[in-house]
């Protein structure tokens, strides 16, 4: 049976600045997706909007009250009326402050909850993506998605949209009140708007691309930094510090230059807004002075309009600031949504068969596999594993040994052929169901930051302390664990730093034992341990494998001699099959591999064959 999923190539997440000058439909799609994260908190959103609408007239009301105070009470010496209007003004200021406090608190709660949901969706989605996706996408880039990109959304979701609504309503009330007070001065103020709108549209197109460039180079910066921190020992051993610093400087310079471009646009835009607002104020003052000289205008109107000018341009300034935030957020959202929309290779569990146990056989039949199209790693592989059987797979590096396990564990789909478990096609079985049956001990053991106990119980978090200690005793890990500060509560550093390779390998064996799989896979599991540790593991693995179907992948042939059957792979092809003695008797590839690792056996065999009468 052919698995068509491999016919589609897994593309890396595009990190370049794509689709420059995106269409509005794309922006609408992004906004609609973001709104789905706000929808669960619609009560909070509705309350924040209602309070924003209700309080949006309080700011514009203050200059009007000032105008009334001057023209109706100060000019006429009406102290009682002035006291009342002053109290109203103080009340408006107080209510405006309360409104701002409540809306700020509500919008921050909305934003934080939405950002939490986005991060959780990204993490769950990343857990579903297949191994091929991670082969082609740098970890640093993905980290940028879940940190910098998500954080860029925080301010927009926290205050951006609702603040914009409040600013627009304030502008509306300001224009209405200005027109009510004096329509001629209002037209002078509004005459600046066309220039401002044109500048904003022009600015939007350029700053959008600039922000995409910044995020692109930030992802590259994070990727390079993460890779080199992980491989710092290699950099130092090969004396590559200066050369790698030069590479980093180039990437860092790209990020710096991208930021400078955004700063350049803002350094033009913000002074332009300030200049326009000052020009409007100057025109209003000049025209007001002309009318005052003609006794065609009151002092209260002039004072209120000077206040209105700054109030009018303050929401516009806020809108431009929010526009900055939104441009950053839209660029980040585009990248996040493209990641969340990456569904290639994700299994749809509906219709997949669940299997609770392994009863009879695993069969590979004419299986072909390639990590890259047509670059075949496995070629027409066929073999069967019976329940309770101990199978060893040996061969040179790159022969496809680990690939077979990756296929069986459903980490990678095969291209052609058929793989079945108890007669059921592997692609038709749910991934979770297959992996529940298989426990894998890898050559490179990964330990998570946390306690020894948490790492041991990773596959079975409900295990009791007694069961955990017994498993450690069986494997022989209890001795070194008890000697650690804190024992089973010893804090493991990132990826097990501070523990030896042998200690990490023992932890992996305990973890597999506690997982209690029906099929045990040992993938070069003892290749990085010393002789003493290997002797501890040998006793434990014999006990582990006695009641389980076992697959042993090994480069060192000394670890596979007790296997029921040994498969010998060479360049993706099954060359030989049989037990240890049968394969030695054939004097084929296995025999040659054995002599390479045990040259003394070849000397002994040659000496015996030279004795007369011995063949």
Task: Please describe what each predicted stretch is.
Residues 122, 126, 235, 336, ...:
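Helix-loop junctions and hydrophobic alpha-helical segments within the transmembrane domains
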Residues 88-96, 100, 193-200, 266-280, ...:
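Hydrophobic alpha-helical segments in the permease module
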């Amino acid at each position: 049976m052919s698995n068509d999923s491999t016919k589609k190539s897994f593309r890396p997440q595009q990190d370049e600045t794509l689709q420059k000058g995106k269409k509005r439909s794309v922006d609408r799609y992004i906004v609609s997706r973001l709104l789905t994260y706000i929808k669960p908190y619609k009560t909070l959103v509705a309350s924040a909007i209602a309070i924003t609408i209700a309080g949006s007239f309080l700011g514009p009301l203050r200059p009007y009250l000032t105008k009334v105070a001057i023209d109706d009470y100060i000019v006429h010496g009406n102290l009682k009326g002035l006291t009342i209007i002053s109290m109203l003004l103080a009340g408006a200021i107080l209510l405006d402050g309360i409104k701002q406090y409540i809306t700020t608190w509500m919008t921050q709660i909305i934003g934080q909850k939405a950002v939490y949901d986005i991060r959780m969706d990204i993490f769950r989605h990343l857990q579903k993506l297949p191994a091929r996706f991670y082969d082609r996408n740098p970890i640093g880039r993905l980290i940028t998605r879940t940190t910098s990109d998500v954080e860029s959304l925080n301010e927009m979701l926290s205050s951006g949209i609702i603040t914009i609504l409040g600013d627009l309503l304030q502008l509306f009330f300001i224009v209405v009140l200005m027109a009510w007070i004096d329509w001629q001065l209002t037209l002078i103020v509004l005459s600046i708007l066309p220039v401002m709108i044109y500048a904003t549209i022009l600015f939007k197109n350029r700053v959008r691309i600039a922000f995409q460039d910044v995020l692109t180079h930030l992802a590259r910066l994070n990727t390079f930094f993460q890779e080199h921190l992980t491989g710092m020992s290699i950099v130092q051993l090969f004396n590559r510090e200066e050369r790698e610093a030069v590479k980093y400087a180039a990437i860092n310079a790209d990020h710096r230059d991208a930021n400078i471009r955004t700063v350049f646009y803002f350094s033009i835009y913000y002074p332009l807004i300030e200049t326009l607002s000052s020009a409007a104020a100057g025109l209003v003052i000049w025209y007001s002075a002309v009318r005052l000289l003609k006794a065609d205008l009151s002092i209260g109107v002039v004072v209120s309009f000077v206040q209105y000018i700054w109030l009018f341009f303050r929401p516009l300034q806020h809108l431009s600031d929010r526009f900055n935030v939104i441009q950053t957020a839209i660029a980040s959202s585009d990248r996040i949504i493209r990641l969340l929309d990456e569904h290639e290779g994700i299994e749809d569990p509906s219709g997949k068969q669940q299997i609770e146990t392994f009863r009879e056989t695993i069969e590979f039949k004419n299986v072909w596999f390639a990590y890259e199209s047509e670059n075949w790693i496995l070629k027409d592989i066929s073999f069967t594993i019976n329940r309770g059987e101990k199978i060893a797979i040996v061969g040179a590096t790159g022969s496809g040994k680990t690939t077979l396990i990756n296929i069986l564990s459903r980490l990678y789909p095969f291209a052609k052929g058929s793989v079945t478990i108890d007669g059921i096609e592997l692609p038709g079985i749910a991934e979770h169901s297959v992996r529940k049956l298989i426990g894998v001990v890898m050559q490179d053991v990964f330990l998570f930051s946390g306690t020894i106990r948490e790492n041991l119980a990773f596959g079975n978090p409900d295990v009791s302390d007694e069961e955990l200690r017994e498993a450690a005793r069986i494997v022989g890990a209890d001795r070194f664990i008890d000697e650690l500060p804190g024992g089973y509560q010893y804090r493991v550093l990132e990826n097990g730093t501070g523990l030896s390779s042998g200690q990490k390998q023992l932890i992996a064996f305990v973890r597999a034992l506690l997982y209690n799989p029906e099929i045990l896979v040992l993938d070069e599991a003892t290749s990085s341990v010393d002789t003493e540790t290997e002797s501890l593991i040998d006793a434990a693995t014999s006990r582990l494998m006695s009641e389980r179907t076992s697959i042993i992948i090994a480069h060192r042939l000394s670890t596979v001699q007790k296997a029921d059957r040994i498969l010998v792979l060479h360049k993706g092809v099954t060359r030989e099959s049989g037990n240890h003695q049968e394969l030695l008797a054939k004097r084929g590839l296995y025999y040659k591999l054995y002599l390479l690792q045990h040259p003394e056996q070849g000397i002994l065999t040659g000496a015996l064959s030279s004795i007369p009468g011995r063949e």
